[in-house]
Amino acid sequence: MEKPEWKPRSDKPRSDKPRSDKPRSDKPRSDKPQERKPFAKRPLLRRELERRVRKFAEPDIPVEITGEELEKRVRFQLTSLAIENAEAVAKHLVALDFFLETDPERAYWHGQSASHRAGRLAIVRERAGIAAVKHGKFDVALRELKAAHRMSANPSILPYIAECERALGNPRKALEIAGSIATNKLTDVEQVELRITSAACRIELGQMDAAVVTLTCKELNLADAPWGNRLRSAYSAALIAANRGNETLPWGK
């Protein structure tokens, strides 16, 4: 089979003549100084914020909340925001705390509003994440809390992250996180919550006796502690799961 003959794109021979015989001039095109056109002005931050807020339906803030109720250390962190935005974020954070136990869904939306306005602040993402945990929005909570931990490296966030992983069906991941935490950097409440989460993971993995061991601690005997009922309920549930429900409860001795 003969190879097809190659043909140039045009039958016209290429010219060896340069495009122009006129030598280039070293003289500038104009003696006038060249003026650069200014860049388009960036839209005002306030306008950007208003546009973003319009896309997000924020919950109403009770009229009695001023934002001044927020802890001073948190208010200080809001000083990097525009004044009006800082005031709005402060009010949302106060409302979040106010509704956290009585109306978790409303607290959740206040947290999302604050995060939408000030997502670059670790404390805002942390509070929003905790509210999401309380409302059972564990996927949202995990995103918020991981972002907060990346920004602040606050160990107090890790027990909540572990709880989210467990709730999302990742008990091994939750135990891995729990094992990486230096518990001496946690408050008593955070340590107890971490024990409860870890024990729940053990039960889900079929490690019933390990769950009982995890919950066996001196805090079981602290009747007036705020975590008392939750800890004792978790301990009793672990005993039942391990078929040891007839054992004497340690706080009854």
Which residue ranges define each predicted feature?
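Structural motif corresponding to the intra-repeat A-B loop/turn of tetratricopeptide repeats
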Residues: 100-102, 135, 168, 205, ...
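Alpha-helical segment of the N-proximal tetratricopeptide repeat
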Residues: 80-116, 127, 133
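Structural register within alpha-helical repeat arrays
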Residues: 95, 127-128, 161, 198, ...
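Solenoid-like repeat scaffolds
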Residues: 78-84, 112-119, 146-153, 180-188, ...
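Basic Arg/Gly/Lys-rich low-complexity intrinsically disordered segments
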Residues: 1-76
